[in-house]
Each structure stands twice: as C-alpha cells, then as structure tokens.
Amino acid sequence: MDTRIKAVATASMYDMTVASRLGMDKETVQATKEKLSKQRWIDAQNGYPEYIPYFPDKPLEKVPEDLTEPTAEWFRFYALKRGHHINALGGFTTTSNLAFMNYHLLDYLDEISPRPILFIVGDRAHSKFFSEEAFNKASEPKELYVVDDAEHIDLYDKTDKIPFDKLELFFKNNFK
C-alpha cells in the first residue's frame, strides 16, 4: 500500500480475481490457463495481443432480449447511448484473465488500515457480494454504504443515486 494514500473509497467494486474464476472447478481453471498461455505465444508471434470487443462499435437502440444478467446489465450501460463510447467497447485482451487467475487482488487488503475504506454498493447490484466480501476482509476503520434501489451500473452515472455527500464528507474527514 502506497503510504501517501490517506483514504480509499470504492463504488461498484469488482474483484477480478474472483470474477475470473467464477463457476470453474480446478480442472477448468487449469484448462483455461493452458488455453490462455498458448494465446500469449500467438500474441507474441503476432506482435500484438488479441482483443475481442464485448460491445458493439455503434450504440444499440435496446438490449437484446436473449441476454441474461449480468450481461444484460452491462449492455444497458456500455452498449446503449447511456454509456457507449467507441474507445470503450469492453472486455480485456484475451489473456488478461491469466494475470487475474494467478494472484488474489485482495490478499493485502488489511494493509490499507489504519487508513479508512468506504465501500459503496447498490442494494440490487449483481456485484454486491464483492464489496461485502472485501468489507469483511478489511481491517478497521471501514464502512459499507448501501444505496437503495441501485444496481451496479447506476453508480456510474445516475447522479440521483451516487452518494456525493457521503463521499465528500468521507474525504474531507480523512484528508486532514
């Protein structure tokens, strides 16, 4: 932890280590690592990494009906005019998950203490468990702030949902 940091706040936090392994058993993890390792060789030979955009290059009028959650939620933001941008088509390089699968991002979460941490999450966020798990692992001082009637993406741009007053007070109190 960079000791210059005085306080940490997250909104709609995602633990990519956990997300990269969700639903996988040990054999599937190993097979995925094998596939991604081979792709790294291909990327090296090509001189650039493979990147497969997750969202369309032009905004859609509506979310495709066959999408399930949380994919439909991502599309409600990134694939529609609401959050679409030509330079933000989602996803990572094909091999990005290999790095996430090889270490746990929250292993040293306790080292943030004694600096305070504020976890902000929507009560309907599919990602809520990431913040709850991180909150449980974190040392004091810490706070889990739940925004009513909000899903993950609402904390990106819905100004009536983003708790600006809470964030302002948190940082004013901790940037002394």
Per-range role (PLM):
Residues 1-77:
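Alpha/beta-hydrolase-fold enzymes
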Residues 17, 91-109, 126:
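Active-site nucleophile elbow and catalytic-triad environment of alpha/beta-hydrolase enzymes
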Residues 110-113, 137-139:
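Short, conserved loop/helix-junction motifs that constitute active-site signature segments
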Residues 112-113, 118-121:
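Short beta-strand/loop motif that positions the catalytic acidic residue
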Residues 122-125, 149-151:
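Acidic beta-to-alpha connecting loop that harbors the catalytic carboxylate
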Residues 124-142:
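Conserved loop-alpha-helix segment in the C-terminal half of the alpha/beta-hydrolase fold
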Residues 144-146:
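Conserved beta-strand scaffold positions in the cores of enzyme catalytic domains, especially
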Residues 148-176:
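Catalytic active-site module of serine/aspartate enzymes centered on a nucleophile-bearing elbow/loop
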